[in-house]
Amino acid sequence: MEIYQLSATELAKKIKSKEVSSKELTQMYIDRIEEFDGDINSVVVRMFDKAIQDAEKADIALSKGEDLGPLHGIPMTIKESYAIEDQKTTWGNEAFKENTAKSDGLAVRRFREAGAHFMGKTNVPLDLADFQSFNSIYGTTNNPWNLERIPGGSSGGSAAALAAGFTGLEAGSDIGGSIRNPAHFCGVYGHKPTHGIIPQTGHELISNVPDSDLSVCGPLARSAEDLKCALDIMAGPAEREATGWKLQLPKPNFKSLKELKVAVWATDEVAPVSNEIEERTTQVGETLAKLGAEVSFDARPNFDPTFAHANYQLLLQSVMAAGMGDEERAKIQKMVEELDESKMTSDAAVLGDKTALFEAASARGAVLSHANWLKANYQREKLKIAWKEFFEEWDILLCPQMAVTAFEH
């Protein structure tokens, strides 16, 4: 295996054992970006000179016996939406083309405090709101495995850079699949953590207090071990909340696969997937069963997935429409008032009118009153309870992230 294919935790061990220097590793990644990223277009903000300087500092610290942290000397990139001091943060939006961060965001600071340094930032779609990664400022990012196909979005540049061997570690954000679908399309690891575990401070265009509802920050990497390492670094309360709570995540409650109880949800009539995706998901479940895990292909959480998705759409669109202008909001309000209520029930969706239900939920969410938001939030809490009850019995729910593999631009 080539060194650029190794995980960040493996690379950190090599740096600390002096098998490779941080400067050598950083230069290797820079050389690969300069040679291959012209076709992929993943690393769109470049800080190569600063990265070499930071790598040299890491090597000097190591020579003095200093340990900078679990990522000592690791060069990395990060999603363009994160603030890095003196670098542009645009979210792919022309209106913010000249927006320059005055300081590092919290996640960036925490990665630096763990010993990492940054070579640049990776591409996103406009306003982080697409399953591909194109914007008019930086252009289109391609999938490293097939340049004709998308890398996913909105953390598409992050996943593409990892898959291409341009970086040791990445971080993205996710409100509707923005970490998960790029990881799926590019064949890397991604983790969308529970909301509230990782502060969003420094992942915004305009300072936003409190954190956005539903949206989360999280890592992308080349291994599950890297995800754990990065989560441990990123997680924990922001400074303003640190006196009120502390993070205490549960430790794994098993030591071998034979102790695991795994539920497999390979497809569903509400969200059918391709035969290939269903077969691969099923194969993983069958393999786990052969290795001794207790596996069920029938176990499900106790709620209606059609209703759950419609409720999610209400809450999602209420977040996405927060900055909507009065004129546009009035148009959507009129459309909502003209909806055919008989087609907007969960029963109607099950009978075949799913699209109408989801479109109606999206429109309603954009103009949701506070009273109706509270009702939707109440339903969300009931769903949380259903999930908690499910995971009291099952350790893992294995299901597809997307219905298909990466599709063409």
Question: Residue locations for each model-derived region?
Answer:
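Conserved small-residue hinge/capping positions at short loops/turns
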Residues: 67-90, 117-119, 123, 129, ...
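Short glycine/serine-rich loop segments
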Residues: 103-234
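Acyltransferase
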Residues: 22-26, 56, 273-301, 326-337, ...
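DPxDG-like acidic metal-binding loop motif
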Residues: 85-98, 164
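Short helix-loop capping/hinge segments that flank enzyme active sites or metal/cofactor-binding pockets
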Residues: 71-91, 256-265, 317-388, 404, ...
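A short helix-breaking turn/cap at a secondary-structure junction
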Residues: 192-285
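An N-terminal boundary/leader segment
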Residues: 1-54, 290-292, 362, 366-367
